[in-house]
Amino acid sequence: MAQSGAKAADLSREPPGEQKPSPSSRQNEEDLGYNLYPERGSRLKKSTVEESLFTFKHKCQLMLQFAMDTSPYAKLLLGAMKSSGCTVFKDRHFSCEDCDGTVSGGFDAATSQIVLCQNNIHQQAHMNRVVTHELIHAFDHCRAQVDWFSNYRHLACSEIRAANLSGDCSFINEFSRFNFGLRKHHQECVRGRALRSILAVRRVSREEAERVVDEVFDSCFNDHAPFGRIPHSKKDAKFAHRDFENRDRYYANL
């Protein structure tokens, strides 16, 4: 799981069965972070009654739909994925589930599915950030041959991009966490959040995780696709979405 070149997979189609890692033991599941998402693999399926209109699931689905309809970050990513041949469908590619209390979402590359932690996401702004963060992982999965399960450099790069472009490290969010700084504060926030995400989903030493993040940081931090810039605020994201929507008009008039 990702906690939040050539095209690797078309998200509009079911992935071939042989691509799924199918962890053979609890040890393997913990190594890949699946233990943080207990509903993965149908281990904790809930009854229809428990999934009624008044549960976390229904609220999660409503907030997801609102994010897809109104968040400029999410709208740009959904449009970019569709343009890349990886159309995202709400019912197929998102799943509201109960998770470990330490995570808010995840991208399951084995199923091309985004997990939204319905028991940990309670506000729309939080949902918007999680959806954006995980859609960046999905976008990377669509556009590149990402080896999520055994190449830590690939995982680190996508985590850096997700932290950088999703608004996770915006001034408002950092202010709410009482994290203050001036010189390269955004870069340090991105580095720290990418590191924590890797440590949460992989059995790897902190020293190795730091080394991998440092190795790929500059190139991945400066990869702003599909935004074309770092969207530091919703206003920036709206401008980026407008530019993305108008990109074909420019070339048509040349």
UniProtKB/Swiss-Prot annotation:
Its EC number is 3.4.24.-. This is Mitochondrial inner membrane protease ATP23 homolog. InterPro entries: Peptidase_M76_ATP23. One of its GO terms (cellular component) is mitochondrion. Residues 1-32 are annotated as: Disordered. PROSITE patterns: ZINC_PROTEASE. GO terms for biological process: mitochondrial protein processing; mitochondrial proton-transporting ATP synthase complex assembly. GO terms for molecular function: metal ion binding; metalloendopeptidase activity. The active site is at E134. It comes from Danio rerio (Zebrafish). A divalent metal cation binds at H133, H137. The keyword Transmembrane does not apply. It comes from the Eukaryota. Belongs to the peptidase M76 family. Keywords: Hydrolase, Metal-binding, Metalloprotease, Protease.
